[in-house]
């Protein structure tokens, strides 16, 4: 037996209408003594571990379909709403950031794509935004993204309909030409920071 479920309102993809869902009859409920659970705070940004569930899958998908094995990480931020990716890669040529952006638009349906260098911490917004404001010349390093069909809401729903396209942004440093030479980035390597973090417990800091 199938019934129409919803719409329940709030953010797209969570409690929306699901036409012709199976009706499930609950006959018993069991409880764990020590349940493992996570919360969901519904508002402008949903609060649940989407990056953990999607980022690795997106990395495997993009690398396998594009062939760019120098892509190290594909991060899906909490605010993404299926529209935002940050791609960390070992860039080997001036053309490669744009090629990676094009591959992301070809193989995955995301509106905003930012490519950063391998030493960027994609989970640190200060690091990501610093690279954008420090390395991006809009006319040279930003492109209008792929345009997708408009998402039409189910009848009777009131929900946010995202724009049909976003932008691709090359926020890398290595192969760009600037009017004035850029100084080297004053930042420890990711390997060194991981080694330091691994000893926090030893120093009583964890």
Predicted feature locations:
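Charged, compositionally biased interaction regions
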Residues: 1-206
């Amino acid at each position: 037996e199938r019934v129409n479920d919803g719409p329940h309102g709030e953010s797209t993809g969570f409690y929306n209408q699901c036409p012709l869902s199976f009706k499930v009859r609950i006959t018993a409920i069991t409880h764990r003594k020590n349940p493992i659970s996570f919360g969901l705070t519904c508002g402008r940004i949903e609060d649940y571990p989407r990056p953990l569930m999607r980022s690795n899958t997106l990395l495997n998908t993009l690398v396998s379909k594009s062939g760019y094995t120098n892509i190290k990480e594909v991060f899906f931020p909490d605010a993404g709403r299926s529209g935002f990716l940050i791609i960390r890669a070992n860039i080997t040529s001036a053309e490669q950031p744009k090629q990676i952006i094009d591959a992301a638009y070809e193989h995955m349906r995301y509106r905003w794509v930012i490519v950063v260098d391998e030493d960027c911490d994609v989970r640190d917004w200060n690091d990501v935004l610093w690279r954008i404001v420090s390395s991006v010349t809009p006319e040279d390093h930003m492109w209008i993204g792929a345009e997708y069909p408009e998402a039409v809401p189910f009848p009777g729903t009131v929900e946010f309909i995202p724009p049909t396209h976003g932008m691709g942004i090359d926020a890398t440093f290595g192969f760009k030409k600037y009017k004035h030479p850029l100084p080297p980035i004053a930042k420890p390597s990711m390997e060194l920071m991981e080694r330091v973090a691994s000893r926090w417990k030893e120093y009583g800091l964890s």
